[in-house]
Swiss-Prot record:
Gene that encodes it: argH
Pathway(s) per entry: Amino-acid biosynthesis; L-arginine biosynthesis; L-arginine from L-ornithine and carbamoyl phosphate: step 3/3
EC assignment: 4.3.2.1
InterPro entries xrefs: Arg_succ_lyase_C, Argininosuccinate_lyase, Fumarase/histidase_N, Fumarate_lyase_CS, Fumarate_lyase_fam, Fumarate_lyase_N, L-Aspartase-like
GO CC terms of this entry: cytosol
Keyword annotations of the record: Amino-acid biosynthesis, Arginine biosynthesis, Cytoplasm, Lyase
HAMAP family: Arg_succ_lyase
Principal place of residence: cytoplasm
Record-level Gene Ontology MF annotations: argininosuccinate lyase activity
PROSITE patterns xref list: FUMARATE_LYASES
Family affiliation: Belongs to the lyase 1 family. Argininosuccinate lyase subfamily.
Subcellular location: Cytoplasm
A GO BP entry: arginine biosynthetic process via ornithine
Name recorded for this polypeptide: Argininosuccinate lyase
Length: 456
């Protein structure tokens, strides 16, 4: 049954119905639509539209419908209803007859769907906060296991300076904490209730919108009916928060994919998150990580989609907004499964400490320490930088590490170099000297890890 039609003499074409109907997407708002309808029954009863018995019967029927349908999406999608609101109202009328037709008094699908979607976002946001926290905890557990494993840090994907694997883990903890903060901000801003805004001008009945908002778990009501029914900022913000977080997950996935290559062999991934080849028996592919990386582009596309949909819409509601849900649902689903997979991957990561240490020792990652040594001897840093560059070039030509060069060879570049230089070129010294807040010294990483573990 359509919720409109008196104005029309002709029937909608089958093609238009297929094009117009949103139930295959918005069926996911079923629980929220019923919850909003129960609260709305109380609201219109408070202003005399329903008597106490009518209100009680409507609420009982809605609760019964909620229990009957549960999570059986096929019971909704196969109904042939135009949208989730039509489905609920039709089922309600089947249960209580004409009384069901009174429920929509003073309410529009415009404020109804805006409310449903915000309720859904609130519930989904809470689940995503839990999933983000689980990835953080997995990173902290990995950092604890591999706290002092020495590895090369990279810039431009070239070995730069030695760091620890624990430090690498905590870098992604910082990123995911910002993701948590962004999500919390978005959830805070959407925590206002549009119900009672009507189609665009506000309901004609003197309901208490503060009470209605509280009944649905919102912090308060929205304050402008035009904005209330046409606002989809929360969709944009959640898609944006997901996009930034997916960027972080994709970067982490790329790091681990590289670390897992035969060329690096820094880590091994567990069997339960990898797959093989139908042709090459030896292959163990990092599919989980590659799919995280791949789904990032999909999430970005959904963000661009909703921004493009909203960019030129006049006030207030327009049917274009029906396109808000599919991308949002897909985005939060994709984000959620990627968070789950990231946590699972991290749980099974094994670090090959011998390989990471050998890689840190190669590539002249201790060159900065030699420059700092020269600075301590009184040489200006820019001059020291140039001298060490020459030393590195010489070492490359000899096929030797800096610490393997004879003292006489080093002194040929800078006479101030003494035999006390060699301890400064060790990996342990390179790490220990980064004993500053945020640095990679074991002492700093240990303290940072302990602080994070107290939080999570």
């Amino acid at each position: 049954m359509a919720l409109w039609g008196g104005r029309f003499q002709g029937q909608a074409s089958a093609l238009f119905q297929l094009f117009n109907d949103s139930l295959p997407v918005d069926y996911r708002l079923f629980v929220q639509d019923v919850e909003g309808s129960i609260a709305w029954a109380d609201a219109i009863a408070s202003v005399g539209i329903l008597n106490a018995d009518e209100c009680s019967r409507l609420k009982a029927a809605l609760t019964e419908l909620l229990e009957e349908v549960g999570e059986d999406e096929s019971a909704i999608i196969g109904s042939g209803a135009e949208d989730i609101h039509s489905f609920v109202e039709t089922k309600l009328i089947e249960k209580v007859g004409d009384l069901g037709k009174k429920l929509h008094t003073g309410r529009s699908r415009n404020d109804q769907v805006a409310t449903d979607l915000k309720l859904w976002c609130k519930a989904s946001g809470g689940l995503l906060e839990t999933k983000l926290t689980a990835v953080i905890q997995a990173l902290l557990a990995l950092a604890s296991r591999e706290l002092d494993a020495v590895m090369p840090g990279y810039t431009h994907l070239q070995r730069a300076q030695p760091v620890t694997f624990g430090h690498w883990c905590l870098a992604y903890v910082e990123m995911l904490e910002r993701d948590l903060s962004r999500l919390a901000d978005a959830l805070k801003r959407l925590n206002t209730c549009p119900l009672g805004s009507g189609a665009l001008a506000g309901t004609a009945y003197a309901i208490d919108r503060h009470e209605l908002a509280a009944a649905l778990g919102f912090g308060g009501p929205t304050l402008n009916s035009l904005d209330s029914v046409s606002d989809r900022d929360h969709v944009v913000e959640l898609c944006a928060a997901a996009s930034v977080s997916m960027m972080h997950l994709s970067r982490m996935a790329e790091d681990l994919i590289f670390f897992n290559t035969g060329e690096a062999a820094f880590v091994e991934l567990a069997d339960n998150v990898t797959s093989g080849s139908s042709l090459m028996p030896q292959k163990k592919n990092p599919d989980a990580l590659e799919l995280i990386r791949g789904k990032t582009g999909r999430v970005y596309g959904n963000l661009v989609g909703i921004l493009t949909t909203m960019k030129a819409l006049p006030l207030a509601y327009n049917k274009d907004m029906q396109e808000d849900k599919e991308g949002l649902f897909d985005t939060l689903d994709s984000w959620g499964i990627c968070l789950d997979m990231a946590a699972l991957v991290l749980e099974g990561v094994k670090v090959n400490r011998d390989n990471t240490k050998q890689a840190a020792q190669a590539g002249y990652a201790n060159a900065t320490e030699l420059a700092d040594y020269l600075v301590a001897k009184g040489m200006p840093f820019r001059e020291a930088h140039h001298v060490v560059g020459e030393v590195v070039l010489h070492a490359i030509s000899k096929g030797q590490a800096l610490e393997a060069l004879p003292l006489a060879s080093l002194q040929s570049f800078a006479a101030v170099i003494g035999d006390d230089v060699y301890p400064h070129l060790s990996l342990d010294e390179c790490l220990a000297k980064r004993d500053v807040l945020g640095g990679t010294a074991i002492k700093q990483v240990t303290a940072a890890l302990a602080a994070k573990q107290q939080q999570y």
